[in-house]
Regions:
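Outer-membrane beta-barrel translocator/channel fold
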Residues: 1, 12-18, 38-39, 56-96, ...
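Repeated loop/turn-to-beta-strand initiation elements of outer-membrane beta-barrel proteins
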Residues: 12-15, 104-112, 148-152, 213-217, ...
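Outer-membrane beta-barrel "beta-signal"
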Residues: 134-155
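Residues on the lipid-exposed face of transmembrane beta-strands in outer-membrane beta-barrel proteins
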Residues: 3-7, 47-53, 66-70, 96-104, ...
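Residues that define the transmembrane beta-barrel architecture of outer-membrane proteins
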Residues: 1, 20, 39-45, 90-96, ...
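Extracellular loop and loop/strand-boundary signature of outer-membrane beta-barrel proteins
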Residues: 33-36, 82-88, 123-130, 188-193, ...
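Transmembrane beta-barrel strands of outer-membrane/channel proteins
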Residues: 1, 28-30, 64-72, 114-120, ...
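Outer-envelope beta-barrel architecture signal
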Residues: 18-24, 58-64, 108-112, 134-138, ...
Length: 273
């Protein structure tokens, strides 16, 4: 179940025509997997954005939408009390959703939507286990429009004058940081979980050539420091009183020099709005 609020450009306006009726907003959703004792019934808070892919008729369009946010209320893995949960290891997980649907404008106030979507819950390897939870499903709902006028239902057929796009170069700079757990290979060829978390940080710097209102492309300089890169283990006896069932007892995890944990490279970028 979802409850959302969104906003968009005025129907028939120049930005609305250029960007295909794009809209964005914030939403809240509730999930039940039929196993509250092991997985919980999480609640997600998220941002969403969507737009028209194609117009089928004056009142019917084929749209896409994606969501991104956080979900809480999970029952994470516990070696003693919830050992059957091999999917999630944290109480808070990232929420990602993408889907396509038909939008039918019924009246000035109401739209009917029907389609399908894919959802992924994960903590991004910040805790183990992190198999995640994936779902696919059908969606059906009603959209209430607060400020839409009767005339707005036909404005989508009007194409206002769009001036020629001034091509130019822009620059994107992204800084990021996080942490992660690591599975390390041992002599038997199996992986065991390291006992701690490792920092991750990096940047992307990309000059982008803006070709038109919707498309830009360029080359990005990417740098990353991954504290878990090339971590290895030796079969040595160390003082672990209890390993929590992780299999780390009796092993020392070794971190190589920083020169083995840095990476720098180039990548191609393309963005279609």
């Amino acid at each position: 179940a979802h409850l959302r609020y969104s906003f968009r450009f005025r129907p028939g306006s120049r930005p609305d025509c250029i960007y295909g009726g794009v809209y964005q907003g914030i939403g809240v959703s509730y999930y039940s997997f039929g196993n509250r004792g092991e997985l919980g019934n999480p609640v997600a808070v998220y941002l969403f954005q969507g737009a028209r892919i194609a117009r089928i008729s004056p009142l019917v369009s084929f749209n896409y939408e994606w969501n991104f946010g956080l979900s809480a209320g999970w029952k994470p893995y516990d070696n003693d009390y919830n050992s059957y949960n091999g999917a999630v290891g944290s109480r808070v997980n990232a929420y990602l959703n993408a889907g396509i649907y038909l939008n039918w404008s019924l009246s000035r106030y109401f739209d009917f939507i029907i389609g399908g979507d894919f959802t992924h819950f994960s903590n991004g390897n910040t805790k183990f286990p992190n198999a995640g939870v994936n779902t696919t499903g059908a969606k059906i709902g009603l959209v209430y429009n607060f400020n839409r006028e009767e005339a707005d239902l036909t404005k989508s057929l009007v194409h206002p004058y769009v001036p020629r796009f001034p091509r130019h170069i822009s620059y994107d700079l992204v800084l990021f940081g996080s942490w992660r757990r690591k599975g390390v290979y041992v002599e038997s060829g199996k992986q065991i979980a390291s006992p701690g978390s490792y920092p991750v940080a990096g940047f992307n710097f990309a000059p982008m050539y803006n070709l038109n209102y919707k498309l830009r492309f360029g080359v990005s300089l990417d740098g990353v420091y991954d504290g878990s890169a090339n971590v290895y283990t030796e079969d040595r006896i160390v003082e672990y009183d209890y390993d929590g069932g992780s299999g780390t007892s009796g092993r020392r995890f070794l971190v190589p020099g920083i020169q083995h944990q840095l990476a720098l490279g180039l990548s191609g970028r393309a963005e279609y709005v």
